[in-house]
């Protein structure tokens, strides 16, 4: 089996509940979406990056591990594009007793369930309609898969948190519908974090909008946080 890796690097976690922790990032090539706010557009094509065998990729990852590595983060693109390879790479890392972390929009429940046994921490990104990448019919299908993946992660008792990227284009009524739907299938006790992530440098949301969106989530989940991307402020990759 082969895998296409765009890059491997050590940095600090710039997003979410593990914000600021030292992390080895394994960025895989390929993504099915073209969100307007994407900050890694060069990794979207599946033919980007470099092709390796699984053994070669495992050796490359091993050569970048340090005693202080807190976790290994599989990111993209979207790692589920190469789900079979991710499962093998993550299993290799788990055997070293290092936590594995998946960042994904969870666009396919079958691919997700194939990877899930080898993942410890799951960041599920729910896309909003204003992401400008699909029509309404395809958006509904995507959200259906993402919801199923959320349920699967919770049932499997993985550390699970939700991220929603918001911009000045985000409509509070659409955001509220998405949040209502999320908490119709899970309870607040089922997740480990809920992050509202504002875009940076493009269509940035106002503070008033961010507070409005925060107030929508708060009745469901009082530990909701608005968290910008740390790495963009400290010059990290």
Feature names for model-found ranges:
Residues 23-25, 71-73, 161-163:
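Short aromatic/hydrophobic contact patches that present stacked aromatics
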Residues 13, 58-62, 151, 183:
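Generic structural signal for well-ordered alpha-helical scaffold segments
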Residues 1-8, 12-15, 34, 38, ...:
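Residue-level signal for well-ordered alpha-helical segments
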Residues 81-224, 229-231, 235-237:
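Conserved AdoMet/S-adenosylmethionine-binding subsite of the radical SAM
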Residues 17-19, 23, 78-80, 128:
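Short, flexible micro-motifs
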Residues 3, 37-120:
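Conserved Radical SAM active-site core
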Residues 1-27, 32-51, 63-65, 236-237:
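N-terminal [4Fe-4S]-dependent radical SAM core
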């Amino acid at each position: 089996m082969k895998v296409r890796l765009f890059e491997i690097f050590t940095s600090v976690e710039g997003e979410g509940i593990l914000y600021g922790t030292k992390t080895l990032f394994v960025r895989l090539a390929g993504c099915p979406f073209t969100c307007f706010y994407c900050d890694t557009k060069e990794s979207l094509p599946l033919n980007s990056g470099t092709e390796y065998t699984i053994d070669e990729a495992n050796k490359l990852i091993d050569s970048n591990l340090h005693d202080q590595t807190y976790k290994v983060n599989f990111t993209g693109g979207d790692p589920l594009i190469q789900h079979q390879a991710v499962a093998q790479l993550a299993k290799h890392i788990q055997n070293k007793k290092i936590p594995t972390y998946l960042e994904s929009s969870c666009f396919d429940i079958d691919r997700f369930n194939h990877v899930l046994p080898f993942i410890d921490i799951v960041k599920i990104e729910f896309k909003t309609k204003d992401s400008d990448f699909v029509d309404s019919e395809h958006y509904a299908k995507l959200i259906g898969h993402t919801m199923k993946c959320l349920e699967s992660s919770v049932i499997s008792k993985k550390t699970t948190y939700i991220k929603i990227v918001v911009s000045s284009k985000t409509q509070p009524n659409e955001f509220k519908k998405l949040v209502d739907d999320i908490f119709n299938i899970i309870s607040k006790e089922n997740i480990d974090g809920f992050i509202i992530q504002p875009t940076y440098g493009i269509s940035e949301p106002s503070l008033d909008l961010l507070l409005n969106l925060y107030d929508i989530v708060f009745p469901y989940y009082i530990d909701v946080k608005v968290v910008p991307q740390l790495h963009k402020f400290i010059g990290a990759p």
